[in-house]
């Protein structure tokens, strides 16, 4: 099915590997350098449309890599139209909670700064999605450890999966960061450090406006 869909985009498939799936979509690695996301249901197709709008709007404005849109298209399944898109494979590797929490404190401290900067920059973007209520911001919507990639120095270098992005309260992106009990997430100590950095950046920014 993936090869047939890509044939319409004149993408010649030399290699194809299943990367994984989430609630909304399945991801495939094509030719070792292109990630294609296919929706699993009708609502997921709408999420992919939002994701494309968000990553196109953000472009290179953030301090880490995010998906781009190399190509996009639609296919029909049982009479319904579904949207998909392809992006370049992002650099980095994933870490589970045990691996992440075992990082040296200076590395964790630096990662807390990187994450705080990413979230602040994301939340500061006013023109990617319509913001109608004062205080609302653009949120990632599913900011969890499994959506981060790390470079060879174990620093956050890429953020994945903007399919749940929407306009809402900035605290939504701290849900997993501040979770005390989730065995798959960052750990609340790290989350509190991120939040402290975030508030510091926000405070400096506000002071600069006066």
Pin down the residues of each PLM region.
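Short, flexible helix/strand-to-coil boundary loops that buttress conserved ligand/catalytic motifs
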Residues: 59, 99, 152, 160, ...
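Active-site activation/catalytic loop segments of kinase-like enzymes and analogous catalytic loops
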Residues: 172-203
């Amino acid at each position: 099915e993936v090869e047939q869909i890509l044939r319409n985009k004149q993408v010649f498939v030399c290699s194809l590997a299943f990367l994984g799936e989430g609630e909304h979509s399945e991801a495939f690695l094509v030719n070792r350098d292109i990630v294609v996301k296919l929706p699993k249901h009708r609502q997921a197709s709408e999420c992919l449309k939002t994701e494309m709008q968000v990553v196109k709007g953000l472009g290179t404005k953030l301090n880490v890599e995010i998906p781009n849109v190399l190509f996009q298209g639609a296919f029909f399944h049982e009479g319904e139209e579904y949207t998909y898109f392809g992006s370049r494979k992002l650099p980095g590797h994933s870490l589970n909670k045990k691996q992440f929490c075992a990082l040296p404190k200076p590395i964790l401290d630096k990662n807390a700064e990187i994450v705080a900067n990413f979230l602040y920059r994301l939340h500061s973007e006013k023109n990617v999605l319509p913001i109608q209520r004062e205080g609302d911001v653009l949120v990632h919507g599913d900011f969890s450890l499994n959506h981060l990639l790390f470079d060879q120095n174990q620093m956050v270098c890429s953020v994945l999966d903007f399919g749940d992005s929407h306009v809402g309260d900035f605290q939504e992106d701290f849900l997993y960061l501040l979770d005390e009990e989730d065995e798959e997430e960052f750990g609340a100590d790290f989350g509190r450090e991120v939040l402290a950095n975030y508030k510091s950046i926000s405070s400096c920014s506000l002071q600069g406006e006066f």
